[in-house]
Amino acid sequence: IAQDKEVDHLFFTGSTRVGKEVAKYAAENLTPTTLELGGKSPAYITNSASLTKSLQRIILGKMLNAGQTCIAPDYLIVDRKHELNFVETFFKILANLYPEIMENSDYSAIINKERLEHLLQLLEDARDKGGDIYILSEGTVEKLQNKKNISEMTTISGKPERKLTPSLVLNPNFRMNLLNEEIFGPILPVFFVESDTEALNLVEKNQRPLAFYWFGDQKEPRQKWLKNIVAGGVTINDCLLHCVQNDLPFGGVSCSGSGTYHGIWGFENFSHRKSIFKQSRFSAMKSVSPPYTKTKYKLLRMLRFLI
């Protein structure tokens, strides 16, 4: 389709890797594209935010379709003020939202076996590179030790559902594969930071995200973030909701996509404004056409200041 000369406009939703291929093939015919590519969308819980309220909303956004949405929070940055009670609070809220989560029909499966195996590989890689992985096992928060088999601990065994238990990865680092690609699953790396500057530096280590989520009650820091962050869209004190506003454009920037849609922006993006001019019976062009007399030169000089 991308190479079809009859296509007027291509809209693609998917990974950045495939989006580059679509754009490359479309460029052969100069076909315009709109690319919605996802990426690594961060959430930031500031020191002025309520940890409980923020996590309730972040968990809802992350666990929708088991993290398999293009604007799911991909990793979490948390002010160190909240570190002491973070893990306990996270899993308490998770258990309230999804009782007996692995048997809960409200909690989605992973799309296919290959994707599930890839997510398990991300967890093993994170553990091998120094990450602390926490899960909820039979109502108890458990840290996965090196001797534990991650596959046995985190998936339903002997059943076809392909469910993966939500996992926190603490002490993440950029050697881990899960910090170098969109996770697209129920795995949440968590960074604890001392300042807004440290948080912003973390965000800028990754490519420009499709979404950014900021949690807090202080206006001045919020405005500073809105001024400095480069992202496709932002939701303040919640997740995902900027995407469902018909009076806001939705789309990515740089590696998270190009072009916007929704509402009037979608109509204009997918339309071509064809200019049409019909000359009247009498044309003024005769007054400025050769031969150029002194009178015509004066007229042209006058027109130069009017146009």
Task: Put a short name on every predicted segment.
Residues 9, 15-173, 236, 304-305:
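ALDH superfamily catalytic-core signature
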Residues 7, 153-159, 163-307:
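Conserved C-terminal structural/oligomerization subdomain of aldehyde/semialdehyde dehydrogenase
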Residues 3, 56, 60, 112, ...:
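Phosphate-coordinating loops and pocket residues in cytosolic domains that bind phosphorylated ligands
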Residues 1, 23, 66-67, 177-178, ...:
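Short, flexible, glycine/charge-rich loop motifs used to bind or transfer phosphoryl groups or to couple energy/partner
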